[in-house]
């Protein structure tokens, strides 16, 4: 479920990015031979086109309705909660929920697989290790 949300969120972000790029026009396209005019912020009471940017004009052979598309609203909605059934609602909160198969191509782990037997060590304790607990005979520690 998490990868699906990530893919969906990525599609939403790409859609938002592409829709804003269409409104702004293309970046970095200005006439290098044309001198840059200084903009005076006090004279701009109303939004005016920037003289340093190239304004994209509408071609005459393309109908207007192709440029006047309504903006789509992309909403990322979290997935609904997973309903496991009434028998799972009656369980105490610390009960282990059994293995749920999410992808059909993955086999659940078998209960009958035995762990690999381990070899027992033939090592003997070293002679200089002394037992100094309260249960050992002749213990020197007082508890």
UniProtKB/Swiss-Prot annotation:
InterPro entries: SMR-like. Keywords: Detoxification, Secreted, Signal. GO terms for cellular component: extracellular region. Pfam families: PROL5-SMR (PF15621). It is found in: Secreted. Residues 1-22 form the signal peptide. Its main location: secreted. Residues 28-52, 116-143 are annotated as: Disordered. Residues 36-45, 122-143 have a biased composition (Polar residues). GO terms for biological process: response to toxic substance. May play a role in protection or detoxification. This is Submaxillary gland androgen-regulated protein 2, isoform delta. It comes from Mus musculus (Mouse). The lineage of its organism: Eukaryota, Metazoa, Chordata, Craniata, Vertebrata. The gene is Smr2.
């Amino acid at each position: 479920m998490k990868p699906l949300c990530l893919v969906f969120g990525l599609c939403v972000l790409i859609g938002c990015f592409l829709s804003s790029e269409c409104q702004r026009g293309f970046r970095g396209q200005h006439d290098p031979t044309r001198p840059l005019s200084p903009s005076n912020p006090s004279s701009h009471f109303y939004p005016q086109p920037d003289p340093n940017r190239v304004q994209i004009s509408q071609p005459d052979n393309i109908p207007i309705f192709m440029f006047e598309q309504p903006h789509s609203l992309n909403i990322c909605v979290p997935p609904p909660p997973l309903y496991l059934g009434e028998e799972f609602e009656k369980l105490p909160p610390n009960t282990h929920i059994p293995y749920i198969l999410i992808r059909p191509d993955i086999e659940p782990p078998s209960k009958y697989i035995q762990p690999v037997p381990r070899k027992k060590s033939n090592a003997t304790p070293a002679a200089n290790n002394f037992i100094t607990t309260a249960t050992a005979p002749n213990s020197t520690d007082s508890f």
